[in-house]
Curated annotation (Swiss-Prot):
Chain's role: Component of specific cytoplasmic RNA granules involved in post-transcriptional regulation of specific genes: probably acts by binding to specific mRNAs and regulating their translation. Required for lens transparency during lens development, by regulating translation of genes such as CRYBB3 and HSPB1 in the developing lens. Also required during spermatogenesis.
Organism of provenance: Bos taurus (Bovine)
Name of the coding gene: TDRD7
Similarity comment: Belongs to the TDRD7 family.
Domain HTH OST-type as annotated: residue spans: 3-76, 233-302, 337-406
Compartments (UniProt record): Cytoplasm
Keywords attached to this entry: Cytoplasm, Differentiation, Phosphoprotein, Repeat, RNA-binding, Spermatogenesis
Assembly and oligomerization: Found in a mRNP complex, at least composed of TDRD1, TDRD6, TDRD7 and DDX4. Found in a complex containing CABLES1, CDK16 and CDK17. Interacts with CABLES1, CDK17 and PIWIL1.
Region named Interaction with CDK17: 861-1098
Gene Ontology BP, a term: P granule organization
Protein name, entry field: Tudor domain-containing protein 7
Signal peptide stretch: none
Length: 1098
């Protein structure tokens, strides 16, 4: 029986290591990374993980955010109070070296408007023979027709595919291998009663809690740290790799090395080590075959590899090892003699363990040996049967595959023993030579070090990489370090090797003389060894800059050593960036101080706008519930405080203008003050400036980004707006800083603030004050459209209202007020607060959205709580965004009432393939595909819908089930099918272009205009062919989802099931991932293998 106390103690320890808590989907992965086991909630008698966590409130505190994310926090006890205090202080502003970078930071990604898939041109098109049978499983060998084609035996076993594994935000890719090859059954599956690590790694990426009813809900990828088994002593691993290579003197594919490693030592080989072999010349020789693939060949370390340096060859001691035999290229490439032919073919095939097409043999033979293959060699392949296995495909000699003949067990034992004995004899010699070379390197002059070239730092290609802000002197030169596998993780690995090298190598001594600019290895604090560059020199001390951390320090000469060239292959990790939107104030001391206090020593997600030498970026703090734009926050923090409006409690203010009313009753007001007067003066000057100056392209916004402040022209004057959401290169959302209004506009309608006014304009704080009516009865509850309409008609854009402040809630940034119209001031009994409570406006009908409206009143612009309600003036300026869209509303008055449906989307015929994108994947029995060729048209339609519905007048809709509408979901308008009506004002909709089920407020549902009914609905439900399973487990669904969701794939159509409703059509397809350069991954093969593994475990 499991000890519940032990589990709870381990759980508390895991939670205490994360002071900001752990999201519930990531908890299992974090627990397993530290303990090696999953949380056994089922064995403890609980149906779900959450149920178990709620049963131990003394250990776990569970909180649910507004977005619905469940986060777990540790509850400290007396025994662990000291630990809790240390964890609370673990992030300090002090500069530290070594392991101070949190590589596991979660980045909240929003749904991109443009898909993050590869363009269609990069998807390889699989070619299939004309006699293809739908019922027959397609042969993967037919997918490839380039380079060296690798074949498959008719009875070949299916090997596990090489797939990418995600740990936290970092993607580790195994070196791809051919997906099919011959292998004994004994070696195919692990005999252990557990899933293979690659399956476990994929499962650890997502939560193990019970499936949500909404299967389309995005599952956040957890930040799983590598398990303890991946922590190796480097020398032990290197010795083991030497032993493996000594047993395979003819070479071994790097992708096969983890398999042999596990077979011999019963441990997993860290995939990160595979990237280091090119830097270990004393361990192995790395060779890239001429086939053009990414797989590499490894050989035992040879003298030839050791001599590859810029040292004078005279300094290298002579070696007893014979030089490798080289075949010089001959003019005309004469044919090889028959006596040597078979031997060379056998030697060649050893390098292609997955087989080689016979048709590819002549070219491969010539590339390797620089001689031509005999012309009649392929006419009778049976002559090669003594040196290789010939496998004919469909009886066609041209389709034969050649395999190297495996030695018999007895021969293999003798050969391995002989090879091991031979390698043992030369092992000490090789190691002595390598140590001698290292000693010569250490003793080399400073001139040698000047020839070392450090590769430049490559900007990450991922959408939102993480960075650690180190320091800054101005906002145009902020020192940062990228966080990730090829950056901070690679640096940590290198520093471990540096510590190992300099701590244990007694022959390495401190430098005696140094030069400015010279690279050194410095023994810094906490016994860390860091790379540094000399800045200046004093007696006994050197001022160095730590090139991977970006700050400088004076160090003793006794702590400085010459940097070994093997530590020069990694780029300097400290680099600089420029904060977008702050360029004009980059040297302002107040701004620099604010930026430094908010950013230094912290990790942020970064949006890279321009990839230049000093990239232009926007920083986001994603540690809380909402992403915080650091650039915009710093800009607002340096506003002129004397221009802000400070409302006083019980004070009366006159000539107040109500600029915006939201559907929850929130108001935005402008109060006369010094800041408002200066703003109006600046806007008037800008109006005159643009009137006198010709509008050139420099004033158009060429690079929109969130947080950018610019100008928008409406009702004959310029107004300040801040970009809040960029939908695409054409459409975006803006907020009017001085009115509180939010709307969608075209990028082409925005203008840059002229440079001469920019600094003054930024100094003026936003003039829209957020208010709410005070002392409204609690029984009112949700505002009805009628109440919002009455309030709008009463006060919106009235410039001479008055307010009395009763309370200022600084935490929420809202003031509670009594509002008066000019006729009723200052009688409190005739205030708007009293009138609206007495009015018959709060009668919630069975469906408040179908309430009767008098013929004299226009339809109210009712939106959600955070969406503005605009009066006549607001409507006018919104409709002035674009004349084209305005005309489209007038010219299509009947478009709201049509029920015409677009034609069904075109699908390939059975037996044909098509490029698809998978936006949603629940399990192999249900996922959604989109035709890749139509995605661009869908993006254009989405842009047009955003602009159209932002200027069109909202209507009360008598919604009906199973009808098509337009609905606003997460700031975007979608074509939806209404699936159900709930009693709480929400409706269930199905996105016809993306295949997702969503719940939205009925106020966000509008008629679908006729112009948006032309493009076929893009979402097609699909089922995976080639696998049979009545019910897919949660774990299997996760594995499938991680391999196909949000990815462009090639689909081979097996069956198309037609239906009169386009959203009820279904297609049965094979899915193929062609993203890897030399391997096609058939998803049904992978899932079949997974089911076999799962059945063995169960």
């Amino acid at each position: 029986m499991l000890e519940a106390d032990l589990v709870s103690k381990m759980l508390r320890a895991v939670l205490q290591s994360h002071k900001n808590g752990i999201a519930l989907p990531r908890l299992q992965g974090e627990y397993r990374s530290l303990t090696g086991d999953w949380i056994p909630f089922k064995q403890l008698g609980y149906p779900t993980l959450e149920a178990y966590l709620r049963s131990v409130p003394a250990v776990v505190r569970i909180e649910t955010s507004r977005s619905g994310e469940v986060t777990c926090y540790a509850v400290a006890c007396t025994e662990t109070a000291r630990i809790a205090q240390l964890v609370a202080r673990q992030r300090s502003s002090k500069r530290k070296t070594g392991r101070q970078v949190n590589c596991q930071m979660r980045v909240k990604k929003t749904m991109p408007f443009f898909l993050e898939g590869k363009p269609k041109a990069t998807l390889r098109q699989p070619g299939f023979s004309s006699d293809f049978s739908v019922s027959k499983k397609p042969n993967s060998t037919l997918l490839r027709n380039k380079g060296i084609s690798l074949g498959v035996k008719s009875d070949a076993e299916v090997l596990p595919y090489t797939l990418q594994t995600t740990i936290g935000n970092e993607v580790f890719k195994d070196v791809p291998v051919q997906s099919h090859m011959t292998m004994s059954t004994n070696n195919r599956f692990s005999p252990k009663a557990s899933l293979p690590p690659r399956f476990q790694m994929h499962l650890s990426r997502t939560c193990t809690k019970e499936m949500s009813d909404n299967l389309n809900q995005a599952v956040e990828k957890p930040n799983v740290t590598p398990p303890a088994s991946y922590t190796y002593k480097m020398d032990e691993v290197q010795n083991r790799i030497k032993e493996i290579l000594n047993k395979h003197s003819n070479g071994i594919w790097i992708s096969k090395l983890p398999h042999f490693y596990k077979e011999l030592y019963k441990e997993e080989l860290n995939q990160g080590i595979l990237q280091q072999f090119e830097h270990w010349p004393h361990i192995c020789t790395v060779e890239k075959p001429c086939s053009g693939g990414q797989d590499l060949l490894l050989y035992p370390a040879k003298r030839k590899q050791l001599l590859r340096s810029e040292l004078n060859t005279e300094k290298v001691p002579p070696s007893p090892l014979p030089a490798p035999k080289q075949i010089p290229p001959l003019k005309g490439c004469p044919a090889v003699m028959p006596g040597d032919f078979k031997e060379k073919v056998a030697e060649l095939l050893v390098k292609y363990s997955s087989g080689l097409w016979a048709s590819a043999l002549p070219k491969t033979f010539e590339d390797m040996y620089k001689v031509k293959l005999p012309e009649d060699a392929l006419k009778n392949l049976d002559l090669l049967s003594d040196v290789c296995t010939v496998d004919y495909i469909s009886g066609n000699p041209q389709k034969a595959i050649l395999y190297a003949k495996l030695p018999s067990p007895a021969d293999k034992i003798l050969k391995d023993a002989e090879q091991a004995h031979g390698n043992y004899d030369i092992k000490s010699t090789v190691e002595q030579e390598y140590l001698q070379i290292e000693e010569n390197i250490a003793e080399s002059t400073d001139t040698f070090m000047e020839t070392v070239t450090i590769p430049p730092l490559i900007i990450p290609t991922e959408t939102s990489p993480s960075v650690l802000v180190v320091e800054l002197s101005n906002t145009n030169e902020v020192v940062i370090r990228y966080v990730g596998k090829d950056y901070s993780a690679a640096q940590e690995l290198m520093e471990d090797e540096m510590k190992e090298y300099y701590s244990k190598n007694s022959k390495v001594t401190p430098v005696q003389t140094v030069q400015i600019g010279q690279l050194l290895a410095v023994n810094a604090e906490e016994d860390a060894w860091l790379r540094a560059q000399v800045i200046s020199m004093e007696e006994g001390k050197i001022k160095v800059c730590y090139v991977d951390y970006g700050f400088s320090e004076n160090v003793e000469k006794s702590k400085a050593y010459r940097l070994n060239p093997k530590f020069c292959s990694l780029s300097f990790q400290a680099t600089k960036c420029k904060l977008a939107g702050l360029e004009v104030l980059s040297d302002d001391p107040d701004l620099v101080k604010v930026v430094e206090s908010l950013t230094c020593g912290k990790i942020f997600a970064v949006e890279i706008l321009e990839k230049t030498d000093i990239p232009l970026v926007v920083l986001y703090d994603t540690s809380g519930e909402d992403d915080i734009n650091i650039n915009a926050t710093c800009l607002k923090a340096i506003c002129d405080k004397s221009l802000e409006v400070h409302l006083q409690v019980d004070a009366m203010y006159t000539n107040v203008r109500v600029t915006n009313i939201c559907s929850d009753g929130t108001l935005y007001c402008q109060v006369p003050c010094k800041g408002l007067n200066k703003l109006n003066d600046l806007l008037h000057k800008i109006e005159e400036y643009f009137h006198c100056k010709h509008m050139t392209s420099e004033y158009f916004v060429s690079l929109p980004f969130c947080g950018k402040v610019c100008l928008f022209h409406c009702k004959g004057k310029w107004l300040r707006v801040e970009i809040t959401n960029v939908h695409s290169s054409r459409a975006l959302d803006v907020q009017f800083l001085d009115a509180g209004t939010v709307t969608s506009v075209k990028v082409s309608e925005l203008r840059e603030i002229p440079p001469r006014f920019l600094q003054e304009m930024i100094s003026v704080p936003p003039q829209a004050i957020k208010c709410c009516l005070a002392d409204l009865p609690q029984s009112i509850g949700m505002w009805t459209p009628d109440a919002v309409l009455w309030l709008r008609d009463s006060v919106l854009n009235c410039s001479d209202c008055s307010i009395k402040v009763t309370k200022v809630d600084e935490t929420r940034g809202i003031a509670h007020i009594y509002l008066f119209t000019p006729k009723n001031f200052p009688d409190p009994h005739r205030s708007i607060n009293r009138q609206i409570t007495n009015a018959d406006l709060w009668k919630h009908q069975k469906d408040v959205f179908l309430s009767a409206i008098s013929s004299g009143a226009s339809s109210p612009n009712t939106k959600s709580a955070n969406t503005p309600i605009l009066g006549n003036t607001g409507e006018t300026f919104r409709k002035s965004l674009t004349d084209v869209l305005k005309k489209s509303v007038v010219n299509h008055p009947s478009s709201f009432f049509t029920k015409e449906l677009p034609p069904p989307v075109h699908l390939s015929k059975p037996g044909e393939h098509m490029d698809v994108y998978v936006p949603v994947a629940c399990h192999p029995g249900y996922f959604v595909i989109q035709p890749w060729q139509e995605i661009h048209k869908l993006e254009v339609l989405m842009e047009e819908m955003i602009l159209y519905y932002s200027v069109s007048e909202e209507r009360h809709v008598a919604v009906e089930k199973d009808q098509v509408y337009a609905a606003k979901v997460e700031n975007k308008w979608h074509r939806v099918l209404l699936k159900g009506i709930l009693t709480n004002g929400l409706v269930s909709v199905y996105e016809l272009d993306y295949g997702k089920h969503e719940l939205v407020n009925m106020r966000k549902v509008q008629p679908l205009a006729d112009m948006f009914r032309k493009l076929p609905f893009q979402a097609v439900t699909a089922q995976l062919a080639g696998v049979k399973c009545n019910q897919w487990s949660e774990e299997a669904s996760m594995v499938f989802r991680n391999h196909v969701e949000k990815k462009p794939l090639v689909a081979l159509v097996q069956t198309v099931i037609e239906n009169t409703n386009p959203w009820d059509r279904k297609v049965v397809v094979y899915l193929v991932d062609t993203s890897l350069p030399d391997t096609d991954i058939w998803i049904h093969d992978f899932m079949s293998e997974y089911l076999v593994e799962l059945s063995k475990v169960n």
